[in-house]
Amino acid sequence: MEASNKLAVLLLWLVMAAATAVHPSYSENSPQDYLTPQNSARAAVGVGPVTWSTKLQQFAEKYAAQRAGDCRLQHSGGPYGENIFWGSAGFDWKAVDAVRSWVDEKQWYNYATNSCAAGKVCGHYTQVVWRATTSIGCARVVCRDNRGVFIICNYEPRGNIAGMKPY
């Protein structure tokens, strides 16, 4: 193959690779990106779906904005159930990453004893699948000074009530 043909093939390959690359978009943090995986986890244990609440979204946005300065993994202390997530700088963490981390805690939850495995956390998972919860609202903020990403979801009614099973 001539050098000019090799160059043309290489350029065509580069153009096609660039055209098919996945580019992040705002749609990767839409309400549906929070709802779909949480509702899938709920359906897996026979619990009905949750719906999006703009009231909870606004609460989450306000608190996420407060965390943008330090990106500390600290709960709001608000009146709703709450799951929070922090992802380190250098990766464009999305809604699906936060929800996956919460749902992955299922492996540590023992329904029979209504407890987490020793030394493990599973309260984020139990909040996701809490039967009484009917609505959620979430927010995501990129923290200042390259400190990572903070993601929060609020739940109403709140879950994780002591002594009660989630479903």
From Swiss-Prot:
Gene3D superfamilies named among the record's database cross-references? CAP
- Span of domain SCP: 37-155
In terms of Pfam families, this protein maps to: CAP (PF00188)
* GO terms for biological process, alphabetical: defense response; sexual reproduction
The record's disulfide annotation reads C71-C143, C116-C122, C138-C153
Query: What induces or represses its expression, per the UniProt entry?
Result: By fungal infection in germinating seeds.
Signal peptide annotation: 1-27
Q: Which UniProt keywords apply?
A: Disulfide bond, Pathogenesis-related protein, Plant defense, Signal
Instruction: Give the highest taxon in the source lineage.
Output: Eukaryota
Question: What InterPro entries is this protein classified in?
Answer: Allrgn_V5/Tpx1_CS (IPR018244), CAP_dom (IPR014044), CAP_sf (IPR035940), CRISP-related (IPR001283), V5_allergen-like (IPR002413)
Entry's Gene Ontology cellular component terms: extracellular space
Which purpose does this protein serve, as stated in its record?
Probably involved in the defense reaction of plants against pathogens.
What's this protein's family per the entry? Belongs to the CRISP family.
Name-wise, this protein is Pathogenesis-related protein PRMS
Q: Which organism is it from?
A: Zea mays
